């Protein structure tokens, strides 16, 4: 059992974060927030996928003023992503958002920061300090020579100090870079010094499969060291794909189990069925199952049921026919064309 780092408890809406709460899955909309219908539609898709917290970009006052309308029509907590303009943060709070992603050192004079913090305190809204290696202060780049993990942590500490001076402690922190090991080292260093909950992820990872690999290694490494309270997989793809990958990372690292885990053989010269097609059919048929079950789709009797005996349900194909098995025990033999349907029927019993 992995011992998680002890962090403070905060709440984003009704979702608990830190202090032993489950590692939460976040994503971010990729719509123009000002397009209310499109944004709500995408958030509802994220809700169906199991997303627990959603972040939306707030580029201007028009976007800020539609947040309340969006909030009314979604179920999960919503975080407003604010840069530079304190008035956008104040409007987002007024509209009823559940959290802010804002760097207080970037929004101007102290009185502006104080206004935002006072409003956040009154509404019990947490703030995520989001440090990105690509946008560190110039003096830190000069001090360290380039965007090092130490520079990232120092940048976060500057923002934290501003909030703590105003007696604000409802804080979550992220320290992201597109370089996996730089990100990991930044989180390691920060977590050795502070107990604020951490939102972890690798930024700008790119498309599938590159982004999935980078995110899985970076997030997985941190989780296995007990670091991380919320995660977001950043991909040049649908946010639903981000959520699906996030849950797979949590499943593999042993933190959360949700839905169907499919194990299937890579195929070899013994395989006489179209495994790729069968896996696709099984995934599609079981896509709405929420209970954690393991399903095996194997290409021959060598791989199934023997090598897949830990699966709750499974099939193993052969030329013209195949077997259906449960917990490694063969239930029946059916025609090859009936294998997938027989498996689905057994699961739904």
Swiss-Prot record:
This is 4-hydroxy-3-methylbut-2-en-1-yl diphosphate synthase (flavodoxin). Keywords: 4Fe-4S, Iron, Iron-sulfur, Isoprene biosynthesis, Metal-binding, Oxidoreductase. Converts 2C-methyl-D-erythritol 2,4-cyclodiphosphate (ME-2,4cPP) into 1-hydroxy-2-methyl-2-(E)-butenyl 4-diphosphate. Binds 1 [4Fe-4S] cluster. Pfam families: GcpE (PF04551). [4Fe-4S] cluster binds at residues 265, 268, 300, 307. GO terms for molecular function: 4 iron, 4 sulfur cluster binding; 4-hydroxy-3-methylbut-2-en-1-yl diphosphate synthase activity (ferredoxin); 4-hydroxy-3-methylbut-2-enyl-diphosphate synthase activity (flavodoxin); iron ion binding. Its cofactor is [4Fe-4S] cluster. It comes from the Bacteria. It comes from Thermodesulfovibrio yellowstonii (strain ATCC 51303 / DSM 11347 / YP87). Belongs to the IspG family.
């Amino acid at each position: 059992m992995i011992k998680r780092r002890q962090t403070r408890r905060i709440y984003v809406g009704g979702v608990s974060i830190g202090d032993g709460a489950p590692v939460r899955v976040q994503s971010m909309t990729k719509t123009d927030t000002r397009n209310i219908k499109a944004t709500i539609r995408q958030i509802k898709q994220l809700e169906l996928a199991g997303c627990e917290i959603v972040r939306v970009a707030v580029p201007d006052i028009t976007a800020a003023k539609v947040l309340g309308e969006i909030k009314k029509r979604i179920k999960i907590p919503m975080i407003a992503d604010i840069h530079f303009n304190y008035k956008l943060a104040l409007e987002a709070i007024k509209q009823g958002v559940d959290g802010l992603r804002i760097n207080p050192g970037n929004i101007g004079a102290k009185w502006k920061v104080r206004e935002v913090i006072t409003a956040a305190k009154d509404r019990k809204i947490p703030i995520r300090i989001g440090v990105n290696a690509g946008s560190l202060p110039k003096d830190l780049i000069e001090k360290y020579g380039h965007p090092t993990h130490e520079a990232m942590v120092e940048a976060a500490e500057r923002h934290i100090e501003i909030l703590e001076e105003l007696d604000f402690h409802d804080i979550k922190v992220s320290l992201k870079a597109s370089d996996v090991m730089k990100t990991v080292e930044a989180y390691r260093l920060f977590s050795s010094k502070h107990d604020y909950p951490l939102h972890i992820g690798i930024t700008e990872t790119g498309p599938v499969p590159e982004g999935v690999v980078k995110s899985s290694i970076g997030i997985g490494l941190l989780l296995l060291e007990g670091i991380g309270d919320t995660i977001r997989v950043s991909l040049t793809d649908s946010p639903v794909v981000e959520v699906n990958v996030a849950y797979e990372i949590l499943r593999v690292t042993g933190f959360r189990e949700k839905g169907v885990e499919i194990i299937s053989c890579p195929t070899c010269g013994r395989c006489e069925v179209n495994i790729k097609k069968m896996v696709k059919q099984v995934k599609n048929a079981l896509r709405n199952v929420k209970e954690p079950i393991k399903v095996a789709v194997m290409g021959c009797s060598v791989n199934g049921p023997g090598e897949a005996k830990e699966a709750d349900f499974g099939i193993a194909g052969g030329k013209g026919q195949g077997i259906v098995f449960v917990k490694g025990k063969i239930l029946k033999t059916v025609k090859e064309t009936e294998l997938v349907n027989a498996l689905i029927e057994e699961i739904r019993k």
